[in-house]
């Protein structure tokens, strides 16, 4: 069957479908291949949708009281007032969700750069995890070190130090790179007021919070303060926490850890968290306790 015969057959089928009320011209089915207009290519960069402040981003078309709605939104990063198109999210809302989700995935699967570690003069050690996949599927290996790594830890930290500050990548490398450089100086400055010095700082790759117990067991440190990237969400991929424990060792209950959480630019600022951590460390040294025992 040639092209002309095929075209006539299609026309007949169309006429039958519309009841014969439409006169379909053969010229209307002429192929338009090769007649498309040229595509316009712009060299301009698209704006980064993640830079929009979600607290002031208002997409409702007909709000009864926009001012009060914005006042409520200013108190929370929750996705309020995002509007809808029929039963669906608006395009901008969906793009923002996908962008925030992508940022969260990047934070989990990317590594803290070697340049960042060298710049801050951290001493690099690694847990028993071989790679990121094993780290995510075997949390137990993220709490232990090999013999060679333990020797590096002992050599760096010494025996029975009063305070150790350690950094672990955890589940968000972005959180470490965004907050550590501001928080550590704040902790050191606060501790210096109490005449407390700290040894060189360890950086732990593939770290779980329990890695501080292995370090405490090896060094017999009085207080260990661990800065670790927390599991990212759609609000932020840069949230870090500080886990502080007195006499951390194998088998220590989670209730003995004191936690400063939600450390990021939209929560507790790194400088503020650092000052608070220094005060907590001094209090732990004085009371020889941490976690819920510190409140007793």
Curated annotation (Swiss-Prot):
One of its GO terms (cellular component) is ethanolamine degradation polyhedral organelle. Catalyzes the deamination of various vicinal amino-alcohols to oxo compounds. Allows this organism to utilize ethanolamine as the sole source of nitrogen and carbon in the presence of external vitamin B12. The basic unit is a heterodimer which dimerizes to form tetramers. The heterotetramers trimerize; 6 large subunits form a core ring with 6 small subunits projecting outwards. Its cofactor is adenosylcob(III)alamin. The lineage of its organism: Bacteria, Bacillati, Bacillota, Clostridia, Lachnospirales. This is Ethanolamine ammonia-lyase small subunit. Binds between the large and small subunits. Adenosylcob(III)alamin binds at residues 209, 230. HAMAP family: EutC. Its EC number is 4.3.1.7. Belongs to the EutC family. GO terms for molecular function: cobalamin binding; ethanolamine ammonia-lyase activity. Keywords: Bacterial microcompartment, Cobalamin, Cobalt, Lyase. It is found in: Bacterial microcompartment. It comes from the Bacteria. GO terms for biological process: amino acid metabolic process; ethanolamine catabolic process. It comes from Lachnoclostridium phytofermentans (strain ATCC 700394 / DSM 18823 / ISDg) (Clostridium phytofermentans). The gene is eutC. It catalyses: ethanolamine = acetaldehyde + NH4(+). NCBIfam families: PRK05465.1 (NF003971). Pathway: Amine and polyamine degradation; ethanolamine degradation.
């Amino acid at each position: 069957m040639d092209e002309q015969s095929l075209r006539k057959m299609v026309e007949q089928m169309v006429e039958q479908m519309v009841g014969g009320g439409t006169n379909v011209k053969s010229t209307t089915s002429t192929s338009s291949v090769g007649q498309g207009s040229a595509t316009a290519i712009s060299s301009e960069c698209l704006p980064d949708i993640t830079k929009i402040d979600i607290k002031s981003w208002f997409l409702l078309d007909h709000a009864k009281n926009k001012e009060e709605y914005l006042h409520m939104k200013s108190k929370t990063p929750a996705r309020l007032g995002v509007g809808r198109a029929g039963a669906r999210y608006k395009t901008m809302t969906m793009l923002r969700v996908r962008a925030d989700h992508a940022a969260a995935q990047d934070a989990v699967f990317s590594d803290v750069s070697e340049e960042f570690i060298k710049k801050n003069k951290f001493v690099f050690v690694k847990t028993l995890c071989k790679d990121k996949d094993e780290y995510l599927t075997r949390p137990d290996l993220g709490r232990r070190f090999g013999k060679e790594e333990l020797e590096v830890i002992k050599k760096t930290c010494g025996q029975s130090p009063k305070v150790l500050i350690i950094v672990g990548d955890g589940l968000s490398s972005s959180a470490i790179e965004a907050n550590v450089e501001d928080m550590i100086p704040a902790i050191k400055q606060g501790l210096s007021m109490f005449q407390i010095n700290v040894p060189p700082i360890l950086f732990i790759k593939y770290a779980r919070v329990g890695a501080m117990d292995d370090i405490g067991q090896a060094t017999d440190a009085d207080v260990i303060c661990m800065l670790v990237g927390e599991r990212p969400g759609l609000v932020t991929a840069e949230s870090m926490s500080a886990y502080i424990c007195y006499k951390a060792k194998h088998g220590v209950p989670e209730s003995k850890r004191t936690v400063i959480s939600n450390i990021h630019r939209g929560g507790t600022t790194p400088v503020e968290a650092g000052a608070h951590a220094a005060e907590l460390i001094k209090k732990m040294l004085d009371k020889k306790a941490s976690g819920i025992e510190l409140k007793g």
